[in-house]
């Protein structure tokens, strides 16, 4: 049984790694601004001595303690934007557990949110946002990937603080109405 488990793990490892590395190549791309926040940073944040009496601060610390990573890739370069669009389309097509959560078309922006189910209807294990369009008068493409145990009711607060374009739409997510 141990051998079978080990063999299955070896077979699945490249699939799992490729999902996480699907967008990492943009980190080294010219004309791409990237922000990658890892589990180590979230651990540091959760250990900060914030006012423990404040329930909002406690919710925030609990939320970041459950996150694995946040990756944001942004470009104004149209050629790179096409690569990013193709990477998102490929990732969504190849991720059978990833379902569309919400679409927003507003003020010259197209924003799509995708998610993988989490421990219950208020949580997801992955949240992917793909934005293309006009942001502050500039044509931009943004990919945001968040993994971990993500509370949909709380994540908009964090992404707003990170100033991720399009993240303001997260506050409109209805947690109990996901579609596949």
Question: Where is each model-derived feature located?
Answer:
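Early exported N-terminus immediately downstream of N-terminal targeting peptides
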Residues: 24-88
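Extended interaction-bearing regions that mediate binding to partners or small molecules
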Residues: 30-36, 64-70, 74-75, 93-111, ...
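A general structural signal for short secondary-structure boundary/capping elements
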Residues: 81, 116-121, 173-180
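Amphipathic, non-transmembrane alpha-helical stretches in extra-cytosolic proteins
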Residues: 45, 57-61, 72, 88, ...
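Bacterial Sec-dependent N-terminal signal peptides
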Residues: 1-25
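C-terminal partner/receptor-binding element of secreted or periplasmic proteins
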Residues: 149-180
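Generic structural motif
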Residues: 4, 15, 40, 75-78, ...
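Surface-exposed, polar helix/loop patches in the mature regions of secreted/periplasmic/lumenal proteins
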Residues: 84-148
